[in-house]
């Protein structure tokens, strides 16, 4: 018997026969902190210290990325009560510090404070990650909320839950700038992966939050993911916002590589040419909306050589599992968030759901031809 697995494009949400929701304005699409159930991916072409406030002001959860120096990363996150990303070796150093070992002095004093730490690695199935997670959660010097991942085996949820991890990033190989699936063959269709993890969570009475990370191609995929996920993490869609961290250039031409047109302005191949400064973004967005200017954002996976070099200029370069390309700027964060909030409210009203918790229990989905779901 063939065990079919599904991606977001393979399914569609069926409205409830009857809905108690008279207007989508009656629904509550926010979490307990009054934020949307969405995280901006900690990628260096999505999030930077200059746009943290932009995301937070628009009710988008954000993680301080690893491209910022560790001292500043920790302080930025602590001041805003948000997550900061660390490598697994940085997580081990923090564990050493709070356990009283002699370590590098750049780690600030953690005693008596509350921190939110995201162990940001590609392969979240390593025993090494689980070991450091247990150390961080068992120490008594400070209160740590821990996010980790990514995982793509449903049963790994059990190990994360038992290790005390609070937020689990789910999904490998589905990002638009990720080449892991195509080059390694490692992949698990996202919708089925989330469903199976959610069922394991319910069966064992788990508390860890599920974050759907990757394969989000548009608004509707967010609504589909939230049937089983507590949050959705977004990279490529946020890169298309004028406020994103990617290098911002303007021009209408494409760069032709091996006969394929990719989103790279010809004049910026090596120098990034006509780069737009952040202080000019509001004026530029006005010109974009008026159809007077075409603007591009550089987007790249965090497993690219360029991104790894940005994290550590002394990094030993290896074979990349990501790609670099340009995307056209299509909106500002405020406009995107207004759309997504209304679309999520609408999906909730169709499925007889006043809250996100009710939404998880409500939707019926059907498998359908991808051709009908475009």
Where in this protein do the model-derived segments appear?
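Alpha/beta catalytic cores of nucleotide-metabolism and tRNA/nucleoside-modifying enzymes
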Residues: 1-19, 185-212, 216-374
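Active-site entrance/lid segments in N-terminal catalytic domains of soluble metabolic enzymes
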Residues: 1-209, 236-241
